[in-house]
Amino acid sequence: MKLSLIIIATSLVIAVVAFPSKDSAATDFDKTESLENVEERVETALDERPRACSKNPGESCTNNCECCGATVVCASVYVAGVEKKSCKSKTSDNGFLNIIGQAANAVQNAASLCV
């Protein structure tokens, strides 16, 4: 019992010494710097994002925002080992599975946050 208490106490002392805390000025600087970085990244992402749909089903695309339609997504198909992306709505030949797939596509489009 005493040995386990000594081991725990020693571990805590080592942890306190090994991980010194930052002073408040350094912490404030880190927060400001990280907020500026996040704001820059968000602005860049918003600028690079397509604003409206421009492709119909069957046409080549690079992301979901380019495809027109609530259930149309930019899907990947591999032909001879090469990835080809095109706008697609149909997910299955089975009618029931196709409806479920289109619902999943609609959720995926909503998550894409296209303007």
Curated annotation (Swiss-Prot):
Pro-sequence residue ranges: 19-51
GO CC annotation: extracellular region
Record PTM: Contains 4 disulfide bonds.
Keyword Disulfide bond in annotation: yes
Tissue/organ expression: Expressed by the venom gland.
Compartments, record wording: Secreted
Signal peptide: 1-18
Protein name in the entry: U7-theraphotoxin-Hs1a
MF GO annotations: toxin activity
Residue ranges that the Swiss-Prot or TrEMBL entry lists as coiled coil: none
Chief location bin: secreted
Key words, A-Z: Disulfide bond, Secreted, Signal, Toxin
Family statement: Belongs to the neurotoxin 25 family. F7 subfamily.
